[in-house]
Amino acid sequence: YHSGKTDDLHTVINYVLPNYDSVYLVGFSLGGNLILKYNGDGLFNLSSKIKASVAISVPVDLKGSSIALQRRENTLYNWRFLLTLSKKMYLKHKQFPDDLDIQSLKLVKKLTDFDEYFTSKINGFKNAQDYYSKASSKQFITNISKPTLLINALDDPFLSESCFPITEAKKNLNFNLMTPRYGGHVGFISKGDFYWSEHQILNFLNSY
């Protein structure tokens, strides 16, 4: 999969639509990028049952986020992600030995390398930059026609400055941007049984 694969999301939504009068979309991190892109890229006719969406801690500019993840302070995150992805690649190779060449794994030192050798190639992109360019949701935000909220914390270590679409938010009344000072990446811890972000999600969606 990749973070711009909106056809997967469209398939799931169409599957559940007959069972509901109203549908609300919520996505976190790369899942949030998927939801924002789905709402704005115009590839599918969105059902009128989809009332509103919320996206949390989203790298709306995948290239910018990939650069942010290469910062020295993110070394542990980078290593952890690569370890998880490498394990998944070996498992997939066992399942499909003739379809998946994992020799390039030894060349992967950072997430951009993984996207260059695997994410992009497996999903039909020319390279990592082509993938980032086409899958990033930022370019589609001004086209979003349904009520949508994006919450990106200013201290999120995975986000570059370009992942705060202030200009785009000013151009689209359907798109709401919140940039709390704290929250990290999908953190937003608060007192009580619910996270601060969960309160914001419910407050926004209950308005529609």
Regions found by a protein language model. Give the residues of each.
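Short, hydrophobic alpha-helix immediately C-terminal to the catalytic nucleophile
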Residues: 10, 14, 36-40, 202
